[in-house]
């Protein structure tokens, strides 16, 4: 019987003498978490990391700034006019190796040679999220099964790292943290003594403060996840803080909250389901188990709209620890193209549509923000309310459109078709003519002319069974062409978009002309037998309409009793299903802004978008 090989003789073993090798996928949070556990558990005397020795001083300065991120900049040895940027981010395993090593009082060795010309290695790895299911050991073994590319440059680079390791304390336990794609070249180089590599001094190394707006573009893991990892690493729990599906779910949910708050639109259940399916499919196409931030943004734009995609990207970029300015460092706003190669771009048209990729006009003002939380609330008076005139024009125009549409639909319902004899009446009925083509006869159509006009329009977006629209108000038209209006909505001053400017979402509204006649609909005892808000608006519409017809647009028609009430008042209800209206127009018309005084009207244009 043959003798079982010792661990030191096993080519697959990561324990070689006093060296323990911990291969990682650079920048990925799963490896950072596993590495921190290993360092805190084993407490090695030396931690060797795959970082250039020339960056040691500035790298330690960057670590001292954490959790605020930094970027190291040094000239490209092959082209001094170009710079190389190295982001120092919490989720990077090399960052975690140095941080945790210093915590356990280990000596930290920067073992990468200062040759200035790092070889380009294939950096395609299986999705690190699989570690949760198979463990880190099986992940590493599965990667090593397939031989990786070897070149003279890779061998020389590995030899330089091996030389640094061979010069460490031979009696101390050494934890070697290196990229997974360099593991086997370094293991081979450690089998024989190595010569000191050529050293190239870098002329100038600078530490920069990246602006918070650019973090999502320059970091490997998106900042939202980095922030959660910072909270996770102190206790290494709870695990769901950095579990990717849970992080993705929380990010999309928080982005949805901001989307509803900023636009007044509501995401439907089917959109959430499709969003989950879309992100899963995009991840599968990329060979990943969980979608990244780019795929999530693409899915958000495809399933919902550009506004939601913006909120997803903005939420992913949220990193509260990062400051927009630094007293000691220069602040830079970098792009992905300056850090990475083969970047992908996604254009989000959030505020200004750009047909045919036209340039945005010069002088386009950015949306104003509060200087500090609660600034606009302090400036809100709340003693009176009024509307925003440009929105009045839009909703009046929409009301006229609905009235024309209602009359047209009623006329269509009353039309009749007959064979052509002496007059084509209101035109040829193509459908009926084609249906009876074998007869060789023409059929014409006669529309029934509607006598009378529409005196009131009621539009119900939501019946509000859950009391999501508690704000009830009635306001009067300011001139002869502006309707009196009663509506229920979300509380506008709970969502301020400017000083004294509240943003709300209609649940439903009533419009009627002529103006200056309507008393408060919501406190009128004549309508108290209404079972809900839509019925109260319909009763008021029947009561205040000076014309025969009253338009009612909702998801379902009113109860039959309202037909009797309408007939008693010599009125007729014209019902239009809400689904028959253009969704884009509905979305636009549903947002309303309420101002706390007439003086705000001059300021509102700077805050509304």
Predicted regions span which residues?
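Compositional signal for N-terminal targeting/processing segments
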Residues: 1-609
């Amino acid at each position: 019987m043959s003798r079982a090989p010792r661990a030191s003789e096993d080519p697959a073993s990561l324990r070689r003498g006093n060296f323990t090798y911990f291969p990682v996928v650079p920048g990925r949070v799963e490896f950072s978490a596993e590495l921190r556990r290993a360092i805190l558990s084993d407490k090695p005397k030396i931690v060797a990391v795959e970082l250039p020795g020339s960056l040691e001083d500035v790298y330690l300065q960057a670590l001292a700034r954490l959790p605020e991120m930094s970027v190291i900049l040094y000239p490209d040895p092959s082209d001094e006019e170009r710079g190389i940027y190295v982001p120092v981010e919490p989720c990077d395993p090399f960052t975690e190796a140095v941080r945790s090593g210093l915590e356990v009082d280990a000596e930290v060795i920067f073992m990468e040679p200062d040759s200035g010309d790092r070889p380009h290695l294939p950096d395609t790895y299986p999705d690190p999220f699989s570690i949760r299911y198979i463990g880190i050991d099986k992940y590493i073994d599965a990667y090593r099964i397939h031989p990786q590319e070897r070149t003279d440059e890779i061998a020389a680079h590995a030899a330089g790292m091996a030389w640094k390791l061979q010069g460490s304390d031979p009696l101390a336990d050494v934890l070697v943290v290196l990229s997974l794609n360099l593991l086997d070249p370094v293991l081979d180089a450690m089998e024989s003594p190595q010569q000191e590599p050529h050293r190239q001094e870098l002329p100038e190394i600078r530490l920069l403060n990246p602006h918070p707006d650019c973090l999502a573009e320059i970091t490997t893991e998106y900042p939202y996840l980095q922030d959660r990892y910072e909270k996770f690493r102190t206790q290494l729990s709870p695990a769901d803080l950095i579990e990717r599906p849970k992080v993705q779910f929380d990010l999309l949910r928080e982005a949805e909250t901001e989307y509803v708050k900023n636009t007044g639109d509501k995401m439907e259940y089917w959109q959430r389901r499709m969003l989950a399916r879309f992100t899963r499919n995009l991840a599968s196409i990329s060979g990943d188990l969980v979608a990244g931030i780019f795929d999530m943004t693409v899915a958000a734009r495809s399933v919902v709209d550009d506004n939601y995609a913006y909120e997803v990207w903005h939420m992913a970029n949220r990193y509260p620890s990062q400051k927009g300015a630094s007293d000691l460092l220069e602040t830079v706003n970098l792009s992905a193209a300056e850090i990475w190669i083969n970047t992908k771009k996604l254009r989000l048209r959030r505020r200004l549509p750009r047909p045919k990729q036209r340039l945005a006009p010069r002088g386009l003002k950015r949306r104003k923000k509060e200087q500090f939380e609660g600034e606009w609330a302090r400036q809100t008076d709340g003693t009176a309310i009024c509307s925003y005139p440009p929105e009045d024009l839009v909703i009046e125009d929409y009301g006229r459109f609905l009235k024309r549409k209602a009359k047209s639909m009623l006329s269509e319902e009353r039309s009749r078709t007959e064979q052509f004899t002496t007059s084509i009446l209101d035109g040829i009925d193509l459908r009926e003519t084609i249906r009876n083509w074998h007869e060789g006869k023409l059929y014409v159509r006669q529309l029934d002319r509607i006598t009378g006009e529409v005196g009131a329009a009621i539009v119900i977006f939501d019946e509000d069974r859950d009391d999501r629209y508690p704000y009830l108000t009635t306001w009067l038209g300011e001139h002869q062409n502006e309707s009196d209006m009663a509506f229920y909505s979300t509380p506008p001053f709970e969502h301020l978009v400017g000083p004294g400017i509240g943003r709300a979402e209609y649940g439903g509204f009533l419009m009627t002309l002529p103006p200056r006649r309507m008393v408060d609909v919501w406190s009128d005892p004549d309508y108290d037998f209404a079972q809900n808000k839509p019925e109260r608006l319909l009763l008021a519409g029947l009561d205040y309409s000076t014309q025969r017809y009253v338009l009612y647009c909702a998801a379902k028609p009113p109860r039959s009793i309202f037909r009797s009430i309408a007939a008693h008042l010599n009125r007729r209800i014209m019902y239009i299903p809400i689904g028959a209206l253009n969704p884009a127009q509905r979305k636009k018309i549903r947002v309303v802004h309420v101002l706390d005084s007439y003086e705000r009207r001059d300021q509102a244009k700077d805050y509304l978008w």
